[in-house]
Amino acid sequence: MNILSKKDIYLDNAACTMVDLNIVKKINKIEKKLFANASGIHKMGLYSLNVLNESRISVARNLNAHKDEIFFAGSGTESVAIAILGTVYNFHEKNPNSKILPHIITSNIEHSAVIENCRLLEKRKQAEITYIACDENGIVNPKDIKKALKENTILVSIMYANNEIGTIQPIQEIAKEIRHFKRFAQDKKFDFEKSSGQVTRHFQNQIFYPVLHTDACQAMNYLFTENIEKLGVDMLSFNSSKIYGGNGVGCLYKKRSVEISPVCGGGGQENNLRSGTENVAGILGLSLALEITNKIKDKESARLIKIRDYAIEELLLLSVSSGYEIILNGSKENRLPNNINISVFGISSELLVIELDAKGIMVSERSACASNGEGSSHVIRALRSAQNKTFDETSGALRITLGRQTIKKDIDTLVKNLSQILEKYKNFN
């Protein structure tokens, strides 16, 4: 049953996308046959295993990767956790007598899946974390990553595109800085036992720490991911719910040469990296969604950029007509084609979300993964800090994220209704 009416406008695609109807049809045709555990050796188990293997091959092909570099998980968050925790656990297994902690570099605007796992490692005294501050446009400077690299740095995890403000991070430039650091380390032949304690580093096949991980959940629909090697990352996380493939499935690309350990025990599925019965129907949905995404990516991005820029222009014009100060959060140029994030000063963003919802327009105030927790957006806080501005607790931000179903008329309806809401509350301030 579709609970959306024809008049409803869904503009929360950064939180979750609608499932592509073509994918629904394809899965419905065979879903009744996919009930069996893919680990079973009977014919129904083998049928599920075949679909699982074909899905893995399809994902690998669409990333220009090897099939044994693709691992399925239950969500994007789990994929991120496997990458981060698995890297640290593997380090401790290989260096049980180390006198120093492994070092991780990330940013202060990462998704909570990255930040909370890093905090967990800090709390357990299993890793040392450096949080790189973004600039006033919400961009992480690769030179800041370079400055933070140390002899005990084992992992750099920087998102490809921000889930709240949509800013695109210079992943290829960051990868370049890490490669330069590795070459320097190899040329100098660092003696970690003397310089840093009891850490032993192995330079096998020129692949060694630090490894580069990126959270690409928001990027897959729009940015370059078709050739992992050219992107320059060692690990990449994404999920199905952001690419019109349905909920409950995540994926981790891990380069063959990168060693990580499982974060939990079990039946040893996914080459012992993620135990648990695979959601084969969901994994099939993810593989089909990625294939569709890669085919229409350029055309759809160009279409949405026009709508996005129109929306930004019209929303900022409300500053004049409404009397409220309205600003765009994050870079206008280096942002996702579907992302608009504004702050309306003097009125609660939560109130605006509720009022717009009452009018059939669905937006959000921040990441859906953070909305259940207390406190304001750490991303907007980081942005205000970089801008040397005071964070306005009462205003927050309004995240408007477009999708394949979005048309220009939807923006006109949004702007009209938002204008009416602002007029309604003007006299309350």
Residue ranges and their predicted role:
Residues M1-N429:
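Pyridoxal 5′-phosphate
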